[in-house]
Amino acid sequence: MPAAWMPVLRLGAYASRVPGPAGGDGAVPIAITCFTRGLDIRKEKADVLCPAGCPLEEFSVFGNIVYASVSSICGAAVHRGVISISGGPVRVYSLPGRENYSSVDANGIQSQTLARWSASFTVTKGKSSTQEATGQAVSTARPPTGKRLKKTPEKKTGNKDCKADIAFLIDGSFNIGQRRFNLQKNFVGKVALMLGIGTEGPHVGLVQASEHPKIEFYLKNFTSAKDVLFAIKEVGFRGGNSNTGKALKHTAQKFFTADTGMRKGIPKVVVVFIDGWPSDDIEEAGIVAREFGVNVFIVSVAKPIPEELGMVQDVAFVDKAVCRNNGFFSYHMPNWFGTTKYVKPLVQKLCSHEQMMCSKTCYNSVNIAFLIDGSSSVGDSNFRLMLEFVSNIAKTFEISDIGAKIAAVQFTYDQRTEFSFTDYSTKENVLAVIRSIRYMSGGTATGDAISFTVRNVFGPVRDSPNKNFLVIITDGQSYDDVRGPAAAAHDAGITIFSVGVAWAPLDDLKDMASKPKESHAFFTREFTGLEPIVSDIIRGICRDFLESQQ
Protein backbone atom coordinates (compact mmCIF):
# COMPACT_ATOMS: atom_id res chain seq x y z
CA MET A 1 0.00 0.00 0.00
CA PRO A 2 1.47 3.44 -0.90
CA ALA A 3 2.87 5.34 2.09
CA ALA A 4 0.97 8.45 1.03
CA TRP A 5 -2.28 6.76 2.04
CA MET A 6 -1.19 6.06 5.60
CA PRO A 7 -2.35 9.40 7.16
CA VAL A 8 -5.78 8.88 5.55
CA LEU A 9 -6.08 5.40 6.99
CA ARG A 10 -5.03 6.65 10.41
CA LEU A 11 -7.60 9.39 10.26
CA GLY A 12 -10.21 6.83 9.31
CA ALA A 13 -9.32 4.87 12.41
CA TYR A 14 -9.68 8.01 14.51
CA ALA A 15 -12.96 8.92 12.86
CA SER A 16 -14.49 5.64 13.96
CA ARG A 17 -14.34 7.01 17.48
CA VAL A 18 -15.91 10.36 16.59
CA PRO A 19 -19.72 10.48 16.71
CA GLY A 20 -21.64 13.13 14.82
CA PRO A 21 -22.92 16.25 16.55
CA ALA A 22 -26.23 14.57 17.27
CA GLY A 23 -24.47 12.12 19.52
CA GLY A 24 -23.87 14.70 22.23
CA ASP A 25 -24.77 14.15 25.83
CA GLY A 26 -26.45 17.51 26.36
CA ALA A 27 -23.68 18.92 28.58
CA VAL A 28 -23.40 22.69 28.86
CA PRO A 29 -20.43 23.86 26.73
CA ILE A 30 -17.40 25.09 28.65
CA ALA A 31 -16.50 28.71 27.83
CA ILE A 32 -12.84 28.85 26.77
CA THR A 33 -10.50 31.59 25.57
CA CYS A 34 -9.15 32.12 22.07
CA PHE A 35 -5.89 30.49 23.11
CA THR A 36 -7.05 27.49 25.15
CA ARG A 37 -5.13 24.51 23.77
CA GLY A 38 -6.12 20.92 23.24
CA LEU A 39 -3.81 19.80 26.04
CA ASP A 40 -5.75 22.06 28.45
CA ILE A 41 -8.87 19.90 27.99
CA ARG A 42 -8.31 16.70 29.95
CA LYS A 43 -11.31 14.77 28.64
CA GLU A 44 -11.72 12.29 25.82
CA LYS A 45 -14.66 14.34 24.56
CA ALA A 46 -15.66 17.87 25.54
CA ASP A 47 -18.10 20.54 24.37
CA VAL A 48 -16.57 24.01 24.48
CA LEU A 49 -17.68 27.51 23.52
CA CYS A 50 -15.24 29.68 21.56
CA PRO A 51 -15.59 33.46 21.99
CA ALA A 52 -16.17 35.90 19.13
CA GLY A 53 -13.50 38.14 17.68
CA CYS A 54 -10.41 35.99 18.16
CA PRO A 55 -7.41 37.46 16.26
CA LEU A 56 -6.63 35.07 13.40
CA GLU A 57 -3.01 36.18 13.11
CA GLU A 58 -2.28 35.18 16.72
CA PHE A 59 -3.61 31.62 16.54
CA SER A 60 -1.05 28.83 16.90
CA VAL A 61 -2.25 25.77 14.99
CA PHE A 62 -0.28 22.64 14.05
CA GLY A 63 -1.68 20.17 11.54
CA ASN A 64 -4.83 19.75 9.48
CA ILE A 65 -8.02 17.91 10.55
CA VAL A 66 -5.94 16.16 13.21
CA TYR A 67 -4.14 18.80 15.27
CA ALA A 68 -1.29 18.57 17.76
CA SER A 69 -2.65 19.10 21.28
CA VAL A 70 -0.49 22.20 21.66
CA SER A 71 -2.73 23.92 19.07
CA SER A 72 -5.42 26.46 19.94
CA ILE A 73 -8.82 24.74 19.97
CA CYS A 74 -10.62 27.79 18.57
CA GLY A 75 -7.87 28.26 15.99
CA ALA A 76 -8.23 24.65 14.88
CA ALA A 77 -12.02 25.04 14.72
CA VAL A 78 -11.76 28.12 12.49
CA HIS A 79 -9.07 26.43 10.39
CA ARG A 80 -11.30 23.40 9.79
CA GLY A 81 -14.38 25.54 9.12
CA VAL A 82 -16.30 24.32 12.16
CA ILE A 83 -16.84 27.94 13.32
CA SER A 84 -16.11 31.42 11.98
CA ILE A 85 -14.48 34.33 13.79
CA SER A 86 -17.91 34.93 15.34
CA GLY A 87 -17.16 31.99 17.64
CA GLY A 88 -19.56 29.26 18.64
CA PRO A 89 -19.82 25.77 20.13
CA VAL A 90 -17.17 23.19 19.26
CA ARG A 91 -16.89 19.52 20.14
CA VAL A 92 -13.32 18.38 20.90
CA TYR A 93 -12.14 14.76 20.66
CA SER A 94 -8.81 13.69 22.13
CA LEU A 95 -6.66 11.50 19.88
CA PRO A 96 -3.27 9.78 20.19
CA GLY A 97 -0.06 11.52 19.24
CA ARG A 98 1.39 11.16 15.77
CA GLU A 99 4.14 12.28 13.42
CA ASN A 100 4.21 14.77 10.54
CA TYR A 101 1.46 17.27 11.32
CA SER A 102 0.98 19.02 7.99
CA SER A 103 0.79 22.72 7.15
CA VAL A 104 -2.37 23.89 5.36
CA ASP A 105 -3.70 27.38 4.65
CA ALA A 106 -7.45 27.36 5.32
CA ASN A 107 -10.05 29.94 6.34
CA GLY A 108 -7.48 32.66 6.95
CA ILE A 109 -5.18 30.54 9.12
CA GLN A 110 -1.87 29.06 8.00
CA SER A 111 -1.32 26.01 10.18
CA GLN A 112 2.25 24.94 10.90
CA THR A 113 4.13 21.70 10.49
CA LEU A 114 5.28 19.71 13.49
CA ALA A 115 7.50 16.65 13.26
CA ARG A 116 5.97 14.84 16.21
CA TRP A 117 3.73 15.41 19.21
CA SER A 118 2.53 13.15 22.02
CA ALA A 119 -1.20 13.90 21.79
CA SER A 120 -3.70 15.15 19.21
CA PHE A 121 -7.29 16.27 18.88
CA THR A 122 -9.88 16.90 16.21
CA VAL A 123 -12.95 19.13 16.21
CA THR A 124 -16.51 19.00 14.92
CA LYS A 125 -19.40 21.42 15.11
CA GLY A 126 -20.84 21.37 18.61
CA LYS A 127 -24.24 22.25 20.02
CA SER A 128 -25.14 24.30 23.03
CA SER A 129 -27.40 22.73 25.65
CA THR A 130 -30.35 24.74 24.28
CA GLN A 131 -29.75 23.36 20.81
CA GLU A 132 -29.52 19.80 22.11
CA ALA A 133 -32.95 20.14 23.74
CA THR A 134 -34.87 22.08 21.09
CA GLY A 135 -32.87 21.93 17.90
CA GLN A 136 -33.08 25.77 17.77
CA ALA A 137 -30.06 27.89 16.90
CA VAL A 138 -28.93 30.10 19.75
CA SER A 139 -26.61 33.08 19.91
CA THR A 140 -23.20 32.59 21.45
CA ALA A 141 -22.36 36.27 21.58
CA ARG A 142 -23.59 36.65 25.18
CA PRO A 143 -24.15 34.26 28.07
CA PRO A 144 -27.74 33.47 29.19
CA THR A 145 -27.68 36.30 31.76
CA GLY A 146 -27.41 38.88 28.98
CA LYS A 147 -24.10 40.11 30.40
CA ARG A 148 -20.94 40.16 28.37
CA LEU A 149 -18.39 37.51 29.13
CA LYS A 150 -15.51 39.13 30.95
CA LYS A 151 -12.22 38.70 29.19
CA THR A 152 -9.75 37.08 31.51
CA PRO A 153 -6.59 39.18 31.47
CA GLU A 154 -3.50 37.32 30.38
CA LYS A 155 -1.30 36.56 33.36
CA LYS A 156 2.07 38.19 33.02
CA THR A 157 4.80 35.67 33.70
CA GLY A 158 8.53 35.28 33.25
CA ASN A 159 11.76 36.86 34.39
CA LYS A 160 11.42 40.59 33.66
CA ASP A 161 15.16 41.03 34.17
CA CYS A 162 15.93 38.68 31.28
CA LYS A 163 14.49 40.15 28.09
CA ALA A 164 15.68 38.19 25.04
CA ASP A 165 14.32 36.34 22.02
CA ILE A 166 16.49 33.21 21.87
CA ALA A 167 16.91 30.52 19.23
CA PHE A 168 18.75 27.40 20.38
CA LEU A 169 20.54 25.96 17.34
CA ILE A 170 21.29 22.37 18.31
CA ASP A 171 23.57 19.86 16.59
CA GLY A 172 21.54 17.04 15.00
CA SER A 173 24.32 15.52 12.87
CA PHE A 174 25.65 11.98 12.75
CA ASN A 175 28.78 13.43 14.36
CA ILE A 176 26.99 13.92 17.67
CA GLY A 177 24.96 10.71 17.51
CA GLN A 178 21.68 9.80 19.18
CA ARG A 179 23.01 9.46 22.74
CA ARG A 180 24.85 12.78 22.90
CA PHE A 181 21.95 14.40 21.02
CA ASN A 182 19.68 13.48 23.94
CA LEU A 183 22.24 14.78 26.45
CA GLN A 184 22.36 18.01 24.45
CA LYS A 185 18.56 18.31 24.65
CA ASN A 186 18.70 17.75 28.41
CA PHE A 187 21.20 20.59 28.76
CA VAL A 188 19.11 22.95 26.61
CA GLY A 189 16.07 22.07 28.73
CA LYS A 190 17.93 23.00 31.92
CA VAL A 191 18.99 26.32 30.40
CA ALA A 192 15.42 27.03 29.27
CA LEU A 193 14.10 26.26 32.74
CA MET A 194 16.54 28.59 34.49
CA LEU A 195 15.95 31.46 32.04
CA GLY A 196 12.49 32.19 33.44
CA ILE A 197 10.50 31.90 30.21
CA GLY A 198 7.21 33.80 30.18
CA THR A 199 5.22 36.57 28.54
CA GLU A 200 7.29 39.22 30.34
CA GLY A 201 10.57 37.32 30.18
CA PRO A 202 12.62 35.51 27.53
CA HIS A 203 10.95 33.70 24.64
CA VAL A 204 12.72 30.74 23.05
CA GLY A 205 12.59 28.61 19.92
CA LEU A 206 14.59 25.68 18.60
CA VAL A 207 16.36 24.94 15.31
CA GLN A 208 18.11 21.67 14.48
CA ALA A 209 21.24 21.73 12.32
CA SER A 210 21.68 18.65 10.16
CA GLU A 211 21.90 18.04 6.42
CA HIS A 212 19.17 20.68 6.06
CA PRO A 213 18.23 23.05 8.91
CA LYS A 214 14.82 22.53 10.48
CA ILE A 215 12.99 25.02 12.68
CA GLU A 216 11.40 22.80 15.33
CA PHE A 217 9.37 25.56 16.99
CA TYR A 218 9.23 29.35 16.94
CA LEU A 219 9.33 32.04 19.62
CA LYS A 220 5.56 32.47 19.61
CA ASN A 221 4.69 28.79 20.01
CA PHE A 222 5.34 28.41 23.74
CA THR A 223 5.45 30.99 26.54
CA SER A 224 5.93 28.71 29.53
CA ALA A 225 8.93 26.65 30.58
CA LYS A 226 6.73 23.57 30.98
CA ASP A 227 5.60 23.66 27.36
CA VAL A 228 9.11 24.41 26.08
CA LEU A 229 10.58 21.47 27.99
CA PHE A 230 7.92 19.17 26.55
CA ALA A 231 8.55 20.48 23.03
CA ILE A 232 12.32 19.95 23.39
CA LYS A 233 11.71 16.40 24.58
CA GLU A 234 9.64 15.70 21.45
CA VAL A 235 12.37 16.81 19.00
CA GLY A 236 13.70 13.85 17.02
CA PHE A 237 17.27 13.20 15.88
CA ARG A 238 17.74 13.95 12.15
CA GLY A 239 21.33 12.93 11.34
CA GLY A 240 23.44 13.93 8.34
CA ASN A 241 26.24 16.50 8.22
CA SER A 242 26.02 19.29 10.78
CA ASN A 243 26.16 22.16 8.23
CA THR A 244 26.18 24.61 11.13
CA GLY A 245 26.97 27.58 8.91
CA LYS A 246 24.01 26.84 6.67
CA ALA A 247 21.75 26.46 9.70
CA LEU A 248 22.99 29.67 11.36
CA LYS A 249 22.44 31.68 8.19
CA HIS A 250 18.95 30.20 7.80
CA THR A 251 18.12 31.03 11.43
CA ALA A 252 19.36 34.62 11.19
CA GLN A 253 17.34 35.25 8.03
CA LYS A 254 14.13 33.30 8.68
CA PHE A 255 13.62 32.77 12.41
CA PHE A 256 13.27 36.32 13.76
CA THR A 257 10.15 37.89 12.23
CA ALA A 258 7.07 39.55 13.69
CA ASP A 259 4.97 36.66 12.37
CA THR A 260 7.04 34.09 14.26
CA GLY A 261 7.00 35.98 17.57
CA MET A 262 9.95 38.38 17.45
CA ARG A 263 9.42 41.38 19.75
CA LYS A 264 10.56 44.89 18.89
CA GLY A 265 13.34 46.28 21.04
CA ILE A 266 14.25 42.86 22.47
CA PRO A 267 17.75 41.42 21.78
CA LYS A 268 17.82 38.64 19.19
CA VAL A 269 20.06 35.75 20.26
CA VAL A 270 21.17 32.49 18.64
CA VAL A 271 22.92 29.95 20.87
CA VAL A 272 24.82 27.59 18.55
CA PHE A 273 25.84 24.19 19.91
CA ILE A 274 28.77 22.59 18.10
CA ASP A 275 29.94 19.10 18.99
CA GLY A 276 33.52 18.98 17.72
CA TRP A 277 33.67 21.30 14.72
CA PRO A 278 31.35 22.51 11.92
CA SER A 279 31.28 20.64 8.62
CA ASP A 280 30.90 23.84 6.56
CA ASP A 281 31.98 27.49 6.58
CA ILE A 282 30.56 29.34 9.56
CA GLU A 283 32.33 32.69 9.14
CA GLU A 284 29.99 33.98 6.41
CA ALA A 285 26.97 32.94 8.47
CA GLY A 286 28.34 34.94 11.40
CA ILE A 287 28.62 38.01 9.17
CA VAL A 288 25.02 37.57 7.98
CA ALA A 289 23.82 37.19 11.58
CA ARG A 290 25.55 40.42 12.61
CA GLU A 291 23.99 42.22 9.64
CA PHE A 292 20.57 41.07 10.86
CA GLY A 293 21.30 42.34 14.38
CA VAL A 294 21.57 38.83 15.85
CA ASN A 295 23.84 38.08 18.82
CA VAL A 296 25.55 34.75 18.13
CA PHE A 297 26.83 32.67 21.05
CA ILE A 298 28.87 29.54 20.32
CA VAL A 299 28.77 26.69 22.83
CA SER A 300 31.54 24.34 21.74
CA VAL A 301 31.82 20.85 23.16
CA ALA A 302 34.76 18.45 22.91
CA LYS A 303 37.38 20.39 20.94
CA PRO A 304 39.16 18.45 18.19
CA ILE A 305 42.27 16.60 19.33
CA PRO A 306 45.59 17.28 17.52
CA GLU A 307 45.10 14.29 15.22
CA GLU A 308 41.75 15.71 14.06
CA LEU A 309 42.86 19.28 13.36
CA GLY A 310 43.57 18.45 9.72
CA MET A 311 39.86 17.80 9.19
CA VAL A 312 38.83 21.20 10.58
CA GLN A 313 38.28 23.83 7.85
CA ASP A 314 39.10 26.74 10.17
CA VAL A 315 40.40 26.21 13.71
CA ALA A 316 39.35 29.79 14.58
CA PHE A 317 35.71 29.14 13.63
CA VAL A 318 34.40 30.23 17.04
CA ASP A 319 36.07 33.65 16.95
CA LYS A 320 34.79 34.30 13.43
CA ALA A 321 31.17 33.32 14.09
CA VAL A 322 30.38 34.97 17.41
CA CYS A 323 28.89 38.46 17.73
CA ARG A 324 32.13 39.89 19.15
CA ASN A 325 35.48 38.19 19.65
CA ASN A 326 35.80 39.37 23.25
CA GLY A 327 35.30 36.10 25.14
CA PHE A 328 31.75 36.93 26.24
CA PHE A 329 30.01 35.19 23.33
CA SER A 330 32.01 31.94 23.38
CA TYR A 331 31.44 29.13 25.85
CA HIS A 332 33.15 25.76 26.11
CA MET A 333 32.21 22.50 27.80
CA PRO A 334 34.60 19.53 27.76
CA ASN A 335 31.82 16.98 27.12
CA TRP A 336 28.08 16.38 27.51
CA PHE A 337 28.41 14.67 30.90
CA GLY A 338 28.01 16.54 34.19
CA THR A 339 26.92 19.75 32.46
CA THR A 340 24.67 21.08 35.24
CA LYS A 341 27.40 23.39 36.55
CA TYR A 342 27.57 25.09 33.15
CA VAL A 343 23.89 26.05 33.06
CA LYS A 344 23.88 29.09 35.35
CA PRO A 345 26.92 30.85 33.81
CA LEU A 346 25.39 30.50 30.34
CA VAL A 347 22.02 31.81 31.54
CA GLN A 348 23.73 34.82 33.10
CA LYS A 349 25.31 35.62 29.75
CA LEU A 350 22.02 35.26 27.88
CA CYS A 351 20.28 37.59 30.34
CA SER A 352 22.94 40.34 30.13
CA HIS A 353 21.07 42.49 27.61
CA GLU A 354 23.51 45.38 28.06
CA GLN A 355 26.24 43.12 26.62
CA MET A 356 24.30 42.25 23.46
CA MET A 357 26.51 44.33 21.19
CA CYS A 358 25.04 43.06 17.94
CA SER A 359 21.54 44.19 18.93
CA LYS A 360 22.62 47.75 19.48
CA THR A 361 21.43 50.13 16.77
CA CYS A 362 20.78 53.84 16.64
CA TYR A 363 17.08 53.05 17.01
CA ASN A 364 17.26 51.07 20.25
CA SER A 365 20.39 52.24 22.08
CA VAL A 366 20.01 56.01 22.49
CA ASN A 367 18.73 58.45 25.11
CA ILE A 368 17.17 61.50 23.42
CA ALA A 369 16.08 64.55 25.43
CA PHE A 370 14.14 67.39 23.83
CA LEU A 371 14.63 70.92 25.20
CA ILE A 372 11.55 72.84 24.04
CA ASP A 373 11.23 76.64 24.00
CA GLY A 374 8.00 77.65 25.74
CA SER A 375 8.58 81.42 25.61
CA SER A 376 5.86 84.00 24.85
CA SER A 377 7.13 84.62 21.32
CA VAL A 378 6.28 81.06 20.28
CA GLY A 379 2.52 81.15 20.79
CA ASP A 380 0.20 78.25 21.45
CA SER A 381 -0.42 77.17 17.83
CA ASN A 382 3.29 77.20 16.98
CA PHE A 383 4.03 75.37 20.23
CA ARG A 384 1.77 72.56 18.96
CA LEU A 385 3.85 72.40 15.77
CA MET A 386 6.98 72.05 17.92
CA LEU A 387 5.39 69.15 19.81
CA GLU A 388 4.48 67.51 16.51
CA PHE A 389 8.13 67.86 15.44
CA VAL A 390 9.23 66.19 18.70
CA SER A 391 6.69 63.37 18.26
CA ASN A 392 7.76 62.66 14.68
CA ILE A 393 11.35 62.18 15.81
CA ALA A 394 10.50 60.16 18.93
CA LYS A 395 8.19 57.70 17.17
CA THR A 396 11.03 56.55 14.89
CA PHE A 397 12.90 54.93 17.78
CA GLU A 398 12.36 51.57 19.48
CA ILE A 399 11.32 52.78 22.91
CA SER A 400 11.32 50.18 25.68
CA ASP A 401 12.67 49.58 29.17
CA ILE A 402 15.85 48.15 27.63
CA GLY A 403 15.80 50.14 24.39
CA ALA A 404 15.69 53.80 23.38
CA LYS A 405 14.53 56.32 25.98
CA ILE A 406 12.95 59.74 25.53
CA ALA A 407 12.71 62.76 27.85
CA ALA A 408 11.43 66.33 27.47
CA VAL A 409 12.05 69.65 29.24
CA GLN A 410 10.19 72.89 28.54
CA PHE A 411 11.88 76.17 29.34
CA THR A 412 11.26 79.91 29.59
CA TYR A 413 13.16 81.72 32.36
CA ASP A 414 12.27 78.64 34.36
CA GLN A 415 12.54 74.97 33.48
CA ARG A 416 9.99 72.19 33.79
CA THR A 417 10.77 68.50 33.30
CA GLU A 418 7.79 67.24 31.35
CA PHE A 419 8.98 63.63 31.70
CA SER A 420 12.31 61.92 32.33
CA PHE A 421 14.01 58.94 30.69
CA THR A 422 12.67 56.50 33.27
CA ASP A 423 9.04 57.68 33.35
CA TYR A 424 7.71 55.90 30.24
CA SER A 425 8.93 52.72 28.56
CA THR A 426 6.50 52.37 25.65
CA LYS A 427 6.21 54.40 22.47
CA GLU A 428 2.46 54.82 22.94
CA ASN A 429 2.88 56.37 26.39
CA VAL A 430 5.70 58.65 25.27
CA LEU A 431 3.73 60.00 22.31
CA ALA A 432 0.65 60.49 24.48
CA VAL A 433 2.50 62.53 27.10
CA ILE A 434 4.17 64.67 24.40
CA ARG A 435 0.73 65.56 23.04
CA SER A 436 -0.43 66.53 26.53
CA ILE A 437 2.39 69.02 27.28
CA ARG A 438 0.96 72.43 28.28
CA TYR A 439 2.44 75.65 26.92
CA MET A 440 4.20 77.70 29.63
CA SER A 441 4.84 81.19 28.08
CA GLY A 442 7.54 83.49 29.45
CA GLY A 443 11.09 84.63 28.68
CA THR A 444 14.02 82.73 27.12
CA ALA A 445 16.96 81.47 29.20
CA THR A 446 18.40 78.69 27.03
CA GLY A 447 21.76 78.44 28.83
CA ASP A 448 20.16 77.76 32.22
CA ALA A 449 17.85 75.25 30.54
CA ILE A 450 20.79 73.32 29.07
CA SER A 451 22.50 73.15 32.48
CA PHE A 452 19.24 72.06 34.12
CA THR A 453 18.74 69.29 31.55
CA VAL A 454 22.31 67.99 31.83
CA ARG A 455 22.07 67.89 35.61
CA ASN A 456 18.51 66.64 36.17
CA VAL A 457 17.69 64.62 33.06
CA PHE A 458 21.00 63.15 31.90
CA GLY A 459 22.52 62.96 35.40
CA PRO A 460 20.43 59.99 36.57
CA VAL A 461 21.36 57.97 33.43
CA ARG A 462 25.06 58.81 33.31
CA ASP A 463 25.90 55.09 33.64
CA SER A 464 23.46 54.03 30.91
CA PRO A 465 24.97 52.06 27.99
CA ASN A 466 22.88 54.20 25.60
CA LYS A 467 24.42 57.14 23.74
CA ASN A 468 23.05 60.52 24.85
CA PHE A 469 21.54 63.15 22.54
CA LEU A 470 19.94 66.55 23.22
CA VAL A 471 17.70 68.25 20.64
CA ILE A 472 17.12 71.95 21.37
CA ILE A 473 14.23 73.77 19.65
CA THR A 474 14.07 77.56 20.12
CA ASP A 475 12.61 80.56 18.29
CA GLY A 476 14.64 83.44 19.70
CA GLN A 477 17.78 84.79 21.29
CA SER A 478 18.64 83.61 24.78
CA TYR A 479 18.90 86.17 27.58
CA ASP A 480 21.83 84.26 29.03
CA ASP A 481 25.03 82.65 27.76
CA VAL A 482 24.64 79.35 25.89
CA ARG A 483 28.28 78.67 25.03
CA GLY A 484 29.45 77.56 28.50
CA PRO A 485 26.50 75.25 29.31
CA ALA A 486 26.69 73.70 25.82
CA ALA A 487 30.43 73.05 26.20
CA ALA A 488 29.78 71.36 29.56
CA ALA A 489 27.16 69.17 27.91
CA HIS A 490 29.60 68.20 25.15
CA ASP A 491 32.21 67.33 27.79
CA ALA A 492 29.64 65.09 29.49
CA GLY A 493 29.33 63.05 26.28
CA ILE A 494 26.04 64.58 25.13
CA THR A 495 25.66 65.26 21.40
CA ILE A 496 23.58 68.40 20.76
CA PHE A 497 21.42 69.20 17.75
CA SER A 498 20.15 72.80 17.74
CA VAL A 499 17.06 73.75 15.77
CA GLY A 500 16.22 77.44 15.38
CA VAL A 501 13.02 79.03 14.13
CA ALA A 502 12.17 82.64 13.16
CA TRP A 503 14.38 84.97 15.26
CA ALA A 504 16.81 82.38 16.64
CA PRO A 505 20.38 83.75 16.07
CA LEU A 506 22.59 81.52 13.93
CA ASP A 507 25.55 82.21 16.24
CA ASP A 508 23.65 80.78 19.23
CA LEU A 509 22.65 77.72 17.24
CA LYS A 510 26.27 77.04 16.25
CA ASP A 511 27.53 77.66 19.80
CA MET A 512 25.13 75.04 21.13
CA ALA A 513 25.55 72.43 18.40
CA SER A 514 28.10 69.61 18.44
CA LYS A 515 30.81 69.39 15.78
CA PRO A 516 30.72 69.48 12.84
CA LYS A 517 28.43 72.49 13.32
CA GLU A 518 27.07 72.31 9.76
CA SER A 519 25.41 68.94 10.37
CA HIS A 520 24.19 69.64 13.92
CA ALA A 521 22.65 73.13 13.59
CA PHE A 522 19.43 73.78 11.64
CA PHE A 523 17.30 76.84 10.93
CA THR A 524 13.90 77.54 9.40
CA ARG A 525 12.00 80.81 9.02
CA GLU A 526 8.60 79.30 9.76
CA PHE A 527 7.38 76.72 12.28
CA THR A 528 5.82 74.84 9.38
CA GLY A 529 9.38 74.33 8.13
CA LEU A 530 10.23 72.04 11.06
CA GLU A 531 8.82 68.93 9.38
CA PRO A 532 11.58 68.56 6.72
CA ILE A 533 14.20 68.73 9.48
CA VAL A 534 12.86 65.56 11.15
CA SER A 535 14.69 63.22 8.77
CA ASP A 536 17.89 65.29 9.10
CA ILE A 537 17.87 64.87 12.88
CA ILE A 538 17.18 61.12 12.68
CA ARG A 539 19.96 60.58 10.12
CA GLY A 540 22.30 62.67 12.25
CA ILE A 541 21.58 60.63 15.38
CA CYS A 542 22.20 57.36 13.51
CA ARG A 543 25.39 58.70 11.92
CA ASP A 544 26.79 59.85 15.27
CA PHE A 545 25.77 56.60 16.95
CA LEU A 546 27.55 54.47 14.33
CA GLU A 547 30.69 56.59 14.60
CA SER A 548 30.68 56.11 18.38
CA GLN A 549 30.60 52.32 17.97
CA GLN A 550 33.77 52.19 15.86
Curated annotation (Swiss-Prot):
Compositionally biased region (Polar residues): 126-139
Places the protein is found: Secreted, Extracellular space, Extracellular matrix
PTM statement from Swiss-Prot or TrEMBL: N-glycosylated.
Disordered as annotated region, ranges: 126-158
Boundaries of every LCCL domain copy: 28-121
Keywords: Disulfide bond, Extracellular matrix, Glycoprotein, Repeat, Secreted, Signal
SMART domains in the cross-refs: LCCL, VWA
UniProt-listed CDD domains: vWA_collagen, vWA_collagen_alphaI-XII-like
Gene Ontology cellular component annotations, sorted alphabetically: collagen-containing extracellular matrix; extracellular region
UniProt cross-references to Gene3D superfamilies, sorted A to Z: LCCL-like domain, von Willebrand factor, type A domain
Any Pfam family the entry gives: VWA
UniProt signal peptide: 1-15
Function: Plays a role in the control of cell shape and motility in the trabecular meshwork.
Protein name, UniProt field: Cochlin
Organism annotation: Cavia porcellus
